[in-house]
Amino acid sequence: MKFVDEAYIDISAGDGGNGCVSFRHEKYKEFGGPDGGDGGRGGHVYAVADVNLNTLVDYRFSRRHDATRGEHGKGSDMFGAAGNDITLRMPVGTIISDAETGEVLYELLTAGEVVTIAKGGDGGYGNLRFKSAINRAPRQKTPGWPGERKNLKLELKVLADVGLLGMPNAGKSTFIAAVSNARPKIADYPFTTLHPNLGVVRVAAEQSFVVADIPGLIEGASEGAGLGHQFLRHLQRTRLLLHVVDLAPFDDSVDPVAQAKAIVGELQKYDAELYNKPRWLVLNKLDMVPAEERAARVKDFVKRFKWKGPVFEISALTREGCEVLIRTIYKHVHEQQQIEAGPKEIDPRFVEVEGDGVDLTDPRFAPRDSE
């Protein structure tokens, strides 16, 4: 399930330092000659593709990024130090374009790829540069060049890690609004969500996952009822499904267990692979159930539903139980990412060997027949 994540940033590379006008002062030497150094170059702004990131959410809260300017030149032939570079880490697949013209400038397609998105200005020349046979005591210098300044648009096609599954009005939109930066339409009638909504859940610094709120399913979705084919197809590439169930429906004639079974039936009819995907049960609207009845109602639901997988009891409205759920989700998603990445290749030259440092299993050290 792909969405487009966008962010806008303003970047400034550092200006170059100014050149210096200075003359050498030595004892018994009245005219020591020029010794003014050049200014240092300004800091560059780099972008690097980081495989551990999957969204642009950090750049929504941090729009401006400035590198430092180079130091000015000094006397005694001292050149100014270069400004500090800054490196912006972005997910693999990020498209960087000019925010005003829309021109695509860079694409980060491979992990570890580095591009210079703004170059620092060159340092100005000190008067040492202008010394000649004719001009023995130059007083010229040049200012540093300005660094590049750009307004950029970052765009990323995001693959949702987690999909929310459930009947209309089960509280999926309320949940995604409670745990992420998404603001879906929320109301007390079914089919509030008419299009998939994307939310980025930040667990900690540089720890996040993407959750997708799919429009509520109805019976017959596997045959296409209620745009069922389109919505079910969105769930196929997620790593985890959360089956959200309204534990306290307003209509007493509605049986949550029957509704949950209907959803599972639609999954099974549509695609066996989707049905076998990791799925967790999330019992929502816990705040509507009296405290003394909660344990019994949850136990009864799980028993009648014949559920043997993970169960989470939450209230999306009050956020009760949400913190534990999102941290558990992140752990699962992170583990899946590590598995998909595969084992890292290890250079055998750097493998530590116990004992005297000789690997006796190496065929080079096998005993010869003459021995």
Curated annotation (Swiss-Prot):
* Entry EC number(s): 3.6.5.-
What are its cofactors? Mg(2+)
Check the record and name the SUPFAM superfamilies matching this protein: Obg GTP-binding protein N-terminal domain (SSF82051), P-loop containing nucleoside triphosphate hydrolases (SSF52540)
GO annotation, biological process: ribosome biogenesis
Any Pfam family the entry gives: MMR_HSR1
**Gene Ontology CC, one term:** cytoplasm
Specify which residues bind GTP according to the UniProt entry for this protein: 166-173, 191-195, 213-216, 284-287, 315-317
State the compartments where it is located.
Answer: Cytoplasm
Q: Where Mg(2+) is bound, by residue?
A: S173, T193
Signal sequence interval, chain numbering: none
Where's the Obg domain? 1-159
For this UniProt record, the keywords arranged alphabetically read as follows:
Cytoplasm, GTP-binding, Hydrolase, Magnesium, Metal-binding, Nucleotide-binding
**A GO MF term:** GTPase activity
Q: What class of enzyme is it?
A: hydrolase
Source domain of life: Bacteria
Per the database record, which ranges form the OBG-type G domain? 160-334
HAMAP family in the cross-refs: GTPase_Obg
**Member of which family?**
Belongs to the TRAFAC class OBG-HflX-like GTPase superfamily. OBG GTPase family.
Protein role: An essential GTPase which binds GTP, GDP and possibly (p)ppGpp with moderate affinity, with high nucleotide exchange rates and a fairly low GTP hydrolysis rate. Plays a role in control of the cell cycle, stress response, ribosome biogenesis and in those bacteria that undergo differentiation, in morphogenesis control.
Which NCBIfam families does the entry link to? Obg_CgtA, PRK12296.1, PRK12297.1, PRK12299.1
Tell me how this protein assembles.
Answer: Monomer.
Q: What is this protein called?
A: GTPase Obg
The organism of origin for this protein: Delftia acidovorans (strain DSM 14801 / SPH-1)
Gene (UniProt): obg
